[in-house]
Curated annotation (Swiss-Prot):
It is found in: Nucleus. GO terms for cellular component: nucleus; RNA polymerase II transcription regulator complex. Interacts with srp (via GATA-type Zn-finger domain); this interaction enhances srp binding to the promoter of crq/croquemort. InterPro entries: Bfc_dom (IPR054459). Disruption phenotype: No loss of viability or obvious developmental defects. Reduced levels of apoptotic cell receptor crq/croquemort in macrophages during embryogenesis stages 11 to 14. No effect on macrophage development or distribution, but reduced ability to engulf and clear apoptotic cells during embryogenesis. This is Transcriptional cofactor Bfc. It comes from Drosophila melanogaster. Keywords: Apoptosis, Nucleus, Transcription, Transcription regulation. The gene is Bfc.
Amino acid sequence: MRMDKSEKRSNLADNFLYMLEFMVDDLLITRPNLCAPEEYPTCTEITFRSVFLNIRDRENGSCVNPCSPKCGKCTLFTLESPITDEDVMHIHVYKKRTESCKFLLGLTELPMKPIFDRVKKEFYSQNINWESNVESHLSRMPKLRGPCKKANDCVCYERNRERREQWCPTSELTKRMLPLFNLCKMQTGNIVLILRLVCNGPSVVSSFPVQRPVCKDPCNCCCPCPPTWPAPCSSPFDPCDPCKTVPAKKT
């Protein structure tokens, strides 16, 4: 069976890494759950496929401070299958003490396919021919085994065929006010959710500093001598060997 170009592209794009950022900007409950204790924290649970987040308005035993900064969360995930019209984000608002003791205040859904389609389309427009770039790099890369004839044409020096460590990520920031409903289909309030979806491509690359280890034994120092010798200030110790004293000159 012959695979066309569109199917081949979708298979490569299945390995994309996505990041979702959430923040509850505002929450208004007009029809409260009378069974829910007011002192319990208000928790917003967000579920989308394998993603699950729990955003609380405060910690247990503390009061809500309107002047405190709002708390948001982010998650990094992949898609095990392409997005369809049936993929929705489930949002539940609870008065929750523990996982086994929580009271539903309202729930709602948010379709996710339009957001994913726009972010993915922008990724392809920002990273033109990234798939052929990866395939060309893998096929022309010098290898220890097998013929390396394709690696002799210096194609790696052409900028249009440069393979990057990480492709240009694309994102979309949206702010939605969604109605909340109870299990009787009655509206109980509204929630304002700020959501940001980031498409990172097939990989994420970042650098990090590594500090050189400090020798524990000063008499067996593994660090090299300082570049300036003799030292600016006269010292009775040898900087390369702290256990050895430097004989003082007689004047």
